[in-house]
Amino acid sequence: MKNNKNAFTLQGETAPFRVTREQMEKVNELHVLGIVAAEVRLKQTGEINHLIGDVGENEREFQKRYGELKRISKQTPIGISGLQQSFDEFLLTDGEAKVLYQVDRQGEPIFGKQAKYTSPGNPFYPVRIQTTLHKELQQKAEEVIEANEIKKGGLVLLDVKTNEILAMASKPSLQVRDENLYKTTLENQMLTPHFPGSVFKTVVAAAVIDQKVNLFNRTFNCNKDLYGENDPQVRMGTLNFKESFARSCNRTFSELGNELLQKDKTVLETYVAALGANEKVGWKGSVFHTPHFEQMPEEKGTTIWGNEENKNSKKAVEQTAIGQKDVRISPLAIANMMATIARNGEKMEVKAVEKIVYKNGADFFTFESHTLNGKQLSYETVKTLQELLRGVVTREKGTGTAFRSLPLSVAGKSGTAQTGKGTRVNRWFAGYFPYENPRYALVVVDLETDSKVNKVTPIFKDMVGAIYQLENEK
């Protein structure tokens, strides 16, 4: 310490010493010259949560964002991803903190004199961001994703009533120690659109029901592929609409997709929006001087069509109707779709942050719940959709029969999407629970996997089990 002319952070072996607020107060009560325990914002090391994000020093970016703030050092760490980035202007330190003490003419401290700690002195700043994450469920999410060796993918868990994110885990983990891996692992896969596969049949089903397509006594030849030309991978025989949804028959939905598009070229866009899964679904609105603030600006919106011409191509429509071709939806948007269905069609924006809190604990800004505008599904349509999603689990040969034994009743939809990358597929299960009184919406996805092992099912089951256990402990 004696050889350091400027204030510095005392390091352990790999990182600064972390202390509790109580320990911080005790250290400062000792009045040891030159040693002060204080709150600082530091760049993290190792693996970090994508939603929370990372901070780092970037003079050029600092100048771009805060060039007019002359009192703050350009070396001040700023948010470069996740909530750290979107809430950076609130989290930025209000000036520099320093340790002041008397020195001799050589600049050496005069020991025995009192050291003085100065900071901007504002009891209100820096503010804290209170996220919606549930500590135990977030830890469980990270554990099960890790234990099941998901290389790319993750999960999103929403509170159905509030539409808040309770847990979000994304792989590959953000690697901050390796510069080469850092850029390739920066993307939060839960906010990035991917091929949804058969999960998208939920949208087609909503349109079919709401448009009152005549399904009475109608059956579909599920011994044919989606084009009605060749044998599919699995011959299912002749199925009605409800059986087709439960067993995920491609031919049924490609046929119905074409019928819908012949009547209305924007039908799929209409029902993706009605289910709360179009564009960006994260919280956005006015926050003080920022009229268009987004909690999750890294979120990317849904794509259904690559170009308008494809709407006139029978095969392109058939591929689109089963969540292939150009369809891309983020896991967050799919989770929002399931939460919308669970709430009987009420559409809401998704929150990751509940409020901003002053340093002294008082509320600074509360993020009120926002509804999503536009068409809303009728009560009758939603009730039928709910029954279809429950049938995936309860019907004989449904693709979700593995969830029957869970302590909470599940409704949902599976999906396996081709990715165009050889044998690699996206494997999904999206649903909500308990079915009778929905409280949670959960999406699990294993992206671009060539593994023959279904890792999605055990992860979904583990999360439901953990929630049941947590609720019963209370």
What do these predicted ranges mean?
Residues 1, 83, 341, 459-467:
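Short amphipathic C-terminal alpha-helix that caps PH/PH-like domains
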Residues 1-152, 174-176, 367-369:
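Extracytoplasmic/periplasmic proteins that interact with beta-lactams or build/remodel peptidoglycan
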Residues 47, 125-129, 151-153, 218, ...:
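Envelope-exposed proteins and targeting segments
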Residues 116, 159-192, 196-197, 206-446:
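Beta-lactam-recognizing serine transpeptidase/beta-lactamase-like catalytic domain environment
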Residues 155-157:
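Short beta-strand scaffold segments in enzyme catalytic cores
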Residues 363, 368-373, 459-474:
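Short, gly/Ser/Thr-rich active-site loops of penicillin-recognizing serine hydrolases
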Residues 448-458:
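A short acidic/glycine-rich loop-to-helix N-cap element
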